[in-house]
Amino acid sequence: MLSRQFVREHPEKVRDALDAKGVDADLDRILEVDEEWRELKARGDELRHDRNEVSSKIGELKQAGDEDAAQEAIERSQALKDELADVEARADDLEAELERLLLTLPMVPDEDAPVGDSEAENVERRREGFDDRRDLPESVVPHYDLGEELDILDFERGAKVSGGGFYFSKGAGARLEHALVQFMLDVHREQGYEDVFPPMPVSARSMEGTGQFPKFVEDAYRIGGENDADYDDDDLWLLPTAEVPVTNMYRDEILLDDDLPVKHQAYSPNFRREAGEHGTETRGIVRVHQFNKVELVNFVRPEDSAERFHGLLDEAEAVLRRLDLPYRVLEMCTGDMGFTQAKKYDIEVWAPGDDMDGGPEMGGRWLEVSSVSNFKDFQARRADIQYRPERHESAEHLHTLNGSGVAVPRVLVAILEYYQNDDGTVTVPEALQPYMNGQTRIEGSRKVGESALGDGDREA
C-alpha cells in the first residue's frame, strides 16, 4: 500500500505507475476523498476547541449567577457536540473509503526498471549453464509424453479424481518430487533460512496484506462460497503461495532492529484457479491448479533491501546451478512486473522438449521457476509490519522481499527433458541422487490395470 502522504505529495508519480502497470484505479477520487477527510479533521479539531472553551465557561457563569448566559452556553456546547458528531461520522466514512481505494493503487516501480507494456519488453540480463550443456537425444520427448510412457505422471487419473489441471506423480516421479523439495530446503538452510511450515487456509485479510486481494480474487480457491460473493476479513481461502501466510506471520507486529534480517523458507502445496488459460501450456504439468513450491521470504531494514534483493536472486539461482540446469535471468518491465513489486527478476529454466513461439534459438522453451521481488514497504504497509530502529525511537515500516526457491513441477519438467537419454530413460541429477537412495536413472515402472493392456489382451 502506498502511504497517504506519498499519494498526496506525488500524485503524478502515482499516475505514472498506474499507466506503467496498466492498472485502472480512480486516483482523482482518492485525492478528492483525502482532501475532504483532512478538511473534516481540521473542522473537528476546531469544534473540539470551541466546545472546550464554551464548556469551561458554564461553571463560571453559573457561579456568577448569570443563568441566562449559562443556559445559552449549554445550548451552544450541545450544538457544537452534535456538529462534531456529524463531522466525525462523515470523516470515519471517508477514511474507510480511502483505505479501500488505496488498496487499488499498485506499487510505484523503481526508476531504473525497464519500461514496457508486456513480457515482450522484459530484458534478458544473462544466461547460465549453456556453455557445457549435456548432449541430448536427437528428438527430445516432451515431459507429458515421457511421463506417461514411464508411468511416473498420470494426467487421466488426476483429472478423474479432481478435474482438469490436476495430476498424480507416481513411483520414481513422486520420489523425484520429494527429492526436489528436500534438496531445495537443504540448499536454503545452508543460506541461513529458518524453516516455516505454514497453514494451508489463509484469511482474506492475509490475502490483502500481501497484495493478492482485492485484485486477484478470481484466481483464488475459496473455502465455501462463490468467488464473486462478498467476503469478510476472516473468510478462508487456499493459499496461492506460501508468501501469504509467511509474510502475514508478523502482521500488526513491531519487530526489533536486532531481529533483522529475518529469512524464512516454507514448503507448501499451492492452489490457483488460473491454470488452463494459456494454450499449449495446458498440456502436462507446466501450469496446473495445485503445485509444490519452496518459498523464500525476507524481512529487512529499508536501507538493506536493494542489496538483499540481489542476494535473494543468487540464493534462488543456487538450486538450478547445483542441479546443472541451464537457465536465464530476466528483469521484468513495468507492464509485466506485477501489482505489488518495485523491482522483479524472473528465473527461467530451459526445457528442450517443446518448441515455443519466440523461444530459445536452440529450441525448446523457457519455463519460469522463480520470481524474485522487492516490495519495499508496500506489503509492510498493507499488513502493518513495522520495526523499531532503536528501543526509544518511533517504529517504521520495514521492507519485504520474496522469491520462489523454486517451483517444483517446472523443474521436474526440465529434468525429464534435459536429462533424457536416447533409450527413453532419465538420468537423475547428481545433486538429487542422495535424496533418492542413490538411484541414478529413472526407467519407469509396470503400469497397473486393464488400461495398460493392448486391446487384444483384454478379456471380453
Curated annotation (Swiss-Prot):
GO cellular component: cytoplasm
Subcellular location: Cytoplasm
Binding residues annotated for L-serine, in chain numbering: 241-243, 295, 404
The enzyme's E.C. designation: 6.1.1.11
Keyword match Disulfide bond: no
Annotated stretches, region: Disordered: 50-71, 109-129
InterPro entries for this protein: aa-tRNA-synt_IIb, aa-tRNA-synth_II, aa-tRNA-synth_II/BPL/LPL, Ser-tRNA-ligase_type_1, Ser-tRNA-synth_1_N, SerRS_1_N_sf, SerRS_core, tRNA-bd_arm
Pfam family, one: Seryl_tRNA_N
Reaction(s) the record says it catalyses: tRNA(Ser) + L-serine + ATP = L-seryl-tRNA(Ser) + AMP + diphosphate + H(+); tRNA(Sec) + L-serine + ATP = L-seryl-tRNA(Sec) + AMP + diphosphate + H(+)
PROSITE patterns for the chain: AA_TRNA_LIGASE_II
Pathway the protein takes part in: Aminoacyl-tRNA biosynthesis; selenocysteinyl-tRNA(Sec) biosynthesis; L-seryl-tRNA(Sec) from L-serine and tRNA(Sec): step 1/1
Protein residues bound to ATP: 272-274, 288, 368-371
Domain notes: Consists of two distinct domains, a catalytic core and a N-terminal extension that is involved in tRNA binding.
Similarity comment text for this entry: Belongs to the class-II aminoacyl-tRNA synthetase family. Type-1 seryl-tRNA synthetase subfamily.
HAMAP family: Ser_tRNA_synth_type1 (MF_00176)
Function of the molecule: Catalyzes the attachment of serine to tRNA(Ser). Is also able to aminoacylate tRNA(Sec) with serine, to form the misacylated tRNA L-seryl-tRNA(Sec), which will be further converted into selenocysteinyl-tRNA(Sec).
Subunit annotation: Homodimer. The tRNA molecule binds across the dimer.
Protein name as annotated: Serine--tRNA ligase
